[in-house]
A protein has these predicted regions:
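Auxiliary, metal-adjacent structural segments of Zn-dependent hydrolase domains
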Residues: 7-8, 12-19, 23-26, 34-115, ...
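Fold-level signature of zinc-dependent metallopeptidase catalytic domains
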Residues: 23-36, 119-122, 151, 160-164, ...
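General structural signal for secondary-structure boundaries
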Residues: 64-67, 124-125, 173-180
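Short pre-active-site segment immediately N-terminal to the catalytic Zn-binding motif
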Residues: 94, 114-132
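Active-site His/Glu-centered metal-binding helix of metallohydrolases
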Residues: 132-141
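Post-HExxH zinc-binding segment in Zn-dependent metallohydrolases
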Residues: 140-182
């Protein structure tokens, strides 16, 4: 789903108050990976130091609208098994998007450890900052601290489970045939 656009970010220690108080971190709409990292450090300092959020490390991936449509069709999961219904879903979402019948999310979050946030490359820098604060820290902290999520899900094992499930479906198809598994 991604193309060399992964930036592993997170709270990397203290950020002096001058960097997130007063002078803006940037003034334009354009973003760079360096600027995303700078915003992440500043937002992380506020989230952790001032709001006492407890978060998993962040893995921020910047994706295109085409990749976001692909993520929609895979129900937001970064790893899945091949199935015709995902292609059907992709075509449906793509048609609605291309004809202006729907917009795309600014982000998708996988509540795992590390927390994976997919940001749209079309977002402006202010929107990227909002998404980092909302998804990479807000969702992240909420799910890390949510007792029901912890009771029924292991954030450390979500990705491994998806790999297992994909292989299980493939094994079943090989053993019983695609039609029987369908």
């Amino acid at each position: 789903m991604t193309k060399d656009t992964t930036v592993v970010l997170g709270h990397h220690g203290p950020v002096d108050n001058a960097s997130h108080r007063g002078a803006p971190l940037s003034t334009g709409a354009e973003w760079t990976f360096e600027l995303l990292a700078k915003y992440d450090r500043a937002i992380g300092a506020i989230a952790v130091d001032e709001f006492d959020l407890d978060c998993y490390p962040n893995q921020i991936e910047v994706i295109s609208s085409e990749q976001m449509l692909d993520a929609y069709s895979m129900v937001g999961l970064p790893i899945g098994y091949p199935h015709w219904s995902f292609g059907k879903s992709f075509i449906h979402h793509e048609h609605e998007y291309r004809t202006g019948m729907r917009g795309l999310a600014y982000e998708i979050v996988i509540n795992s450890n590390p927390c994976i946030a997919y940001l749209m490359e079309e977002n402006t820098m202010p929107m990227q900052a909002l998404v980092i604060a909302h998804a990479s820290y807000g969702h992240n902290s909420f799910f890390k601290g949510n007792y029901l999520f912890r009771q029924w899900t292991s954030a450390d094992a979500i990705i491994d489970y998806m790999v297992f499930a994909r292989q299980y479906v493939r094994d079943c198809e090989e053993k019983h045939g695609v039609a029987a598994v369908e």
